[in-house]
């Protein structure tokens, strides 16, 4: 029995039928992103028939032959960079092409002289995405100053705002980024506030989708980061790098690729450590060491025209949580967190002639996060942050009834105590494990007028958790549960597992209505259930989406888009009984499990316009959200869980310019204005809403203005120079020292205000050495802007990194 939203039952029944069909795959949610590589081959201005076309990339070698019109088509091509070789009696050609979701269409003139280089394909703007979609190839990823850091790479995307400890907020959303790796999404069921879901050193190609999402995409909508991982071609060989720099940082990577039978194997290992892993609450960075160990394997096996791809990634990260000495935390506090992630996917692709493909396969993820508290010092720190009297935690209840089946009855709050989330000190020891399995099936068929796609996905999640939240000595629970020691600390344990199931079906079509118009339309159905020992509930939604595009030649277009989105809440949360027990002074009954999925209506217009040799993309979006999802903190601990606001509004306007430079270089610039507000906190599970105003309030991740720009210039000797710049107007703050821009219609009313405006630059120079090696010199935050990433914010106080240097040596940069 489900507690609400029973109107989703018909959809759920249909989706469960599909889940049985897919059960034999026993894998995880997947959304295969493949494209079409096509082109026309000529010689002496005449079409060339029978030319042999070979495309090598993504661990694959794909082949085709031109027809009588000189045209070739390779369907079902994974996104990535490809070396294309064309051979015919009339001549040959060799070029390198980046293939993104919209595909690539080449026009190649054969020559008797072989010319090798990278082509910058000029084709109509991406028709399936938004005005600010972009791709990052291997050169952009490895030669950017942000290389090696996923947050630093993401912050260069249009509409990105820097949050604390590696969190990145894109397009006004809290952080709901959808990562898809080699066709399979990475589940994100644990509430992770530090660290990254995937190691950036294992990425060879990124397609970043920013909006106008077709029906195949679901769950998270700040941005879709479609990743093609490490791949190899040619003779077996090594690749690697070694970097050392500020704060004792050491970062080393060693990779190797080889052929095994008809297949290609790529393996890589990364080890990283240093003394500044997170953004500390104080100007300096005490107790802030970190480490990261990552192992990666990819094996791709062609079987005739088909291929099978296996991807395995494992990481183990450790973090010391920085101490807030200025806020009263003892300098010798030793709070730590570890994160362990194993992700594997197996994808099978079958081309259907030259006009379609079928993809399916399983994936699996196991994530474990452990928190290790320091009770004595945690209590000292928490007591220092209590705004009331030292005895308020002990005196928070005037009386209570007997304990019945573990439930404290009839709690009566003490009216003389102004109890809040910081009245008591907490210490957390936590161990949470999420296991995700499921299956997928995706089909696409291309014709002259239509590109039809449909598919189904299923995932099952089991979250096992053990929370031990200990209240300070002198608390309101010990006299009730342990009356013999009324002044002792008391621990509230929560070991209730959560089990969730998500099923989705989608169908979408691209209708090419002549040369000037195109209609993309589709519908997606989502069904989501979650149950535990104390609750069971389920939800569903049908989400129509449509995008109409008008083309003005090959490089100019405008579009209008409407879509409905459905975002499930995280499957990690505090149980109702534990939430009630921790909040007895605020609750009179056991907390209800009242979390809801977020439901959005999205309106978007945009386009692409030729500007010189480059492309100017424009995107204007309005999102109206019901039951907007945010998160809240459990005391002063690293334990977070989702909450809902009754309404949310996000408006963003972005202009993004990009142009290719010589030798695969690039220049880009993005300017974004964002407005993100929410209203009416409605979640009582952790009592975060008592005393919170009900009017529109800027979200804690609301940054009104951001501007990013960057350049990668490659020289003739194989070296390069890269520079990135970022300006942000600052995130929301409850305080306003210095009269920094505040909220309100005119930007001058009282808080939440904005702290702190910042302008930073990072630069890297690569010097080519003999044998494909390179020496790298990098400076981050060149002008040493020591700004607050967050200040008096729901995310706490966090300082940005200072100026930092590193020097490195790379092996096999070609």
Residue ranges of model-derived segments:
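Conserved C-terminal beta-signal and adjacent last beta-strands/turns
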Residues: 16, 301-304, 337, 698-814
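Short, acidic, small-residue-rich periplasmic hinge/interaction motif at the N-terminus
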Residues: 40-46, 52-58, 87-90, 100-143, ...
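N-terminal periplasmic accessory domains that precede
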Residues: 105-108, 150-153, 168, 193-196, ...
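Extracytoplasmic beta-strand/coil segments of soluble accessory domains associated
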Residues: 149-186, 204
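Short acidic/polar hinge/loop motifs at secondary-structure boundaries
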Residues: 184-210
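Transmembrane beta-barrel wall of Gram-negative outer-membrane proteins
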Residues: 244-273, 282-319, 336-357
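Membrane-embedded beta-barrel scaffold of Gram-negative outer-membrane proteins
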Residues: 359-363, 367-371, 551, 559, ...
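Gram-negative outer-membrane beta-barrel transporters
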Residues: 513-514, 620-626, 641-737, 783
């Amino acid at each position: 029995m489900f507690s609400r939203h029973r109107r989703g039952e018909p959809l759920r029944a249909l989706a469960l039928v599909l889940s049985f069909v897919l059960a034999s795959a026993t894998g995880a949610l997947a959304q295969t992103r493949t494209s079409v590589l096509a082109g026309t081959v000529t010689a002496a201005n005449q079409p060339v028939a029978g030319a042999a076309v070979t495309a090598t990339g993504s661990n694959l070698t794909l082949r085709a032959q031109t027809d009588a019109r000189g045209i070739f088509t390779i369907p079902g091509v994974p996104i990535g960079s490809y070396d294309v070789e064309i051979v015919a009696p009339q001549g040959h050609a060799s070029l390198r092409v980046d293939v993104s979701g919209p595909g690539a269409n080449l026009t190649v003139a054969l020559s008797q002289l072989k010319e090798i280089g990278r082509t910058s394909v000029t084709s109509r703007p991406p028709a399936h995405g938004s005005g600010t979609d972009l791709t990052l190839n291997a050169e952009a990823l490895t030669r950017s100053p942000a290389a090696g850091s996923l947050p630093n790479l993401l912050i260069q995307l249009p509409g990105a705002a820097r949050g604390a400890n590696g969190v990145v907020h894109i397009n006004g959303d809290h952080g709901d980024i959808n990562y898809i790796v080699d066709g399979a999404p990475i589940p994100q069921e644990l509430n992770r506030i530090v660290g990254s879901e995937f190691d950036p050193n294992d990425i060879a190609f990124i397609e970043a989708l920013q909006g106008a999402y077709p029906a195949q995409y679901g769950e998270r909508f700040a941005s879709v980061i479609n990743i093609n991982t490490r791949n190899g071609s040619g003779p077996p060989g090594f690749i690697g790098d070694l970097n050392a720099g500020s704060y004792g940082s050491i970062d080393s990577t060693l990779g190797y690729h080889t052929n095994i039978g008809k297949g290609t194997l790529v393996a890589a290992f990364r080890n990283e450590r240093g003394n500044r892993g997170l953004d500390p609450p104080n100007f300096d960075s005490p107790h802030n060491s970190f480490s990261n160990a990552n192992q990666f394997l990819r094996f791709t096996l062609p079987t005739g025209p088909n291929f099978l791809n296996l991807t395995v990634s494992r990481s183990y990260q450790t973090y010391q949580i920085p101490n807030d000495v200025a806020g009263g935390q003892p300098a010798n506090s030793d709070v730590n967190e570890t994160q362990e992630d194993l992700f594997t996917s197996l994808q099978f692709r079958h081309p259907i002639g030259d006009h379609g493909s079928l993809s399916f396969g399983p994936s699996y993820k196991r994530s474990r996060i452990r928190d290790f508290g320091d009770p004595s010092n945690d209590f000292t720190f928490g007591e220092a942050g209590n705004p009331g009297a030292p005895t308020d935690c002990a005196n928070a209840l005037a009386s209570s009834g007997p304990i019945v089946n573990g439930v404290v009855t009839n709690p009566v709050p003490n009216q003389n105590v102004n109890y809040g989330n910081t009245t008591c000190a907490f210490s957390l020891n936590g161990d949470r494990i999420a296991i995700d399995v499921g299956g997928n099936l995706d089909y696409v068929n291309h014709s002259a007028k239509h590109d039809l796609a449909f598919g189904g996905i299923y995932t099952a999640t089991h979250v096992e958790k053990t929370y031990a939240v200990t209240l300070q000595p002198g608390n309101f629970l010990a006299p009730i549960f342990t009356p013999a020691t009324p002044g002792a600390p008391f621990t509230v344990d929560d070991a209730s597992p959560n089990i969730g199931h998500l099923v989705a079906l989608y169908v979408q079509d691209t209708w090419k209505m002549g040369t000037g118009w195109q209609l993309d339309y589709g519908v997606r159905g989502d069904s989501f259930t979650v149950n535990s020992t104390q609750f069971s509930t389920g939800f569903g939604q049908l989400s129509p989406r449509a995008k109409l595009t008008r083309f003005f030649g090959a490089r100019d277009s405008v579009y209008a888009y409407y879509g409905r989105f459905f975002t499930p809440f995280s499957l990690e949360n505090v149980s109702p009984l534990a939430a009630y027990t921790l909040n007895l002074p605020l609750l009179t009954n056991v907390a209800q499990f009242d979390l809801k999925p977020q439901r959005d209506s999205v309106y978007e217009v945009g386009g692409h316009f030729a500007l010189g040799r480059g492309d100017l993309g424009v995107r204007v979006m309005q999102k109206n959200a019901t039951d907007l999802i945010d998160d809240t903190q459990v005391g002063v601990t690293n334990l977070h869980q989702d909450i809902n606001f009754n309404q949310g509004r996000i408006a963003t306007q972005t202009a993004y310019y990009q142009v290719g430079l010589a030798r695969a270089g690039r220049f880009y610039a993005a300017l974004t204005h964002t407005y993100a507000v929410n209203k009416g906190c409605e979640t009582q599970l952790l009592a975060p809403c008592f005393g919170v105003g009900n009017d529109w309030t800027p979200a804690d991740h609301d940054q009104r203005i951001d501007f990013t720009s960057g350049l990668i210039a490659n020289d003739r000797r194989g070296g390069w120079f890269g520079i990135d710049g970022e300006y942000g107007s600052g995130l929301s703050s409850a305080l306003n020292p210095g009269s920094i821009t505040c909220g309100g219609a005119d930007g001058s009313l009282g808080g939440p205000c904005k702290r702190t405006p910042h302008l930073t630059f990072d630069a890297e120079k690569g010097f080519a050495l003999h044998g494909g090696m390179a020496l790298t010199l990098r400076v981050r935050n060149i002008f040493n802007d020591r700004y607050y990433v967050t200040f008096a914010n729901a995310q706490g106080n966090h300082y940005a990194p200072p100026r930092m240097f590193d020097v490195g040596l790379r092996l096999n940069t070609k």
